[in-house]
């Protein structure tokens, strides 16, 4: 038996005892599920652990299940080291939260930091729920839409997934109404369509889900750029260009009108000021001015 096999066997012994070797020496690897983390009963999923660090060995384990720890020799291609762990046929015992680690040959007891957790869920165990859209599966851009997942089965939790997205949304089921349990998923103002499915699960087995609902295609009509702006975005980003032209035209008209109004107001104030000064002059001065005016008029008559 080679030294490496013995070393990895020792690592496995530590895992069985619930004690990890020294970890966090290297950067954490990444853990992905192919084709995805939702796996139908009896199907197989590939968990790929990879890193740009040249790891010779990868370890995969399920949280709380040290006996399920797996070891693979890493493959190296184009500066990336990876290992593909085949999990299946999928059963309830294989569902759960997984993490992976990397290690190098010369220090097998020094593991990398753990990858981010990855939840593997088994589906297809119970009756499928129903999925509907309010006000309907076809909505205008910017219109609010709510998806409702319901079933006669007493599921504690409902899960909504969108095709092409890894993460799902979950809501607790509401009280029983008209013989059904339901959860509503508000999606907010619609911008892009997509295909949605929902699942049901029970509180004591969160990794075991029902069959998928029938797929629901949500279509968005109209130009998304004309949809309602979000509260954090200025309306000019999503507003109508024609409305912008009207604003510009109104501004062009207002500018000269404001200048003219200011000019007239200035003239009016000046006249008021001159009139006030005339009213405050002494009476004698006004008499002299009147006499001077008469003399000027007389002179003009004499010359005529």
Swiss-Prot record:
Alphabetized GO MF terms: transmembrane signaling receptor activity
Glycosylation sites: 84, 178, 211
Region spans: Disordered: 220-239, 280-304
Spans traversing the lipid bilayer: 246-265
Cystine crosslinks: 49-100, 149-198
Keyword check for Cell membrane: yes
Cytoplasmic face residues: 266-304
Location of this chain's protein in the cell: Cell membrane
GO cellular component, as recorded: membrane; plasma membrane
InterPro entries: Ig-like_dom_sf (IPR036179), Ig-like_fold (IPR013783), Ig-like_Receptors_ImmuneReg (IPR050412), Ig_sub (IPR003599), Immunoglobulin_dom (IPR013151)
Main location: membrane
Membrane topology, record value: Single-pass type I membrane protein
Protein's GO biological process: immune response; immune response-regulating signaling pathway; stimulatory killer cell immunoglobulin-like receptor signaling pathway
Extracellular topology ranges: 22-245
Residues annotated as signal peptide: 1-21
Record keywords: Cell membrane, Disulfide bond, Glycoprotein, Immunoglobulin domain, Membrane, Receptor, Repeat, Signal, Transmembrane, Transmembrane helix
Stated role: Receptor on natural killer (NK) cells for HLA-C alleles. Does not inhibit the activity of NK cells.
Protein name: Killer cell immunoglobulin-like receptor 2DS2
Origin organism lineage: Eukaryota, Metazoa, Chordata, Craniata, Vertebrata
Gene: KIR2DS2
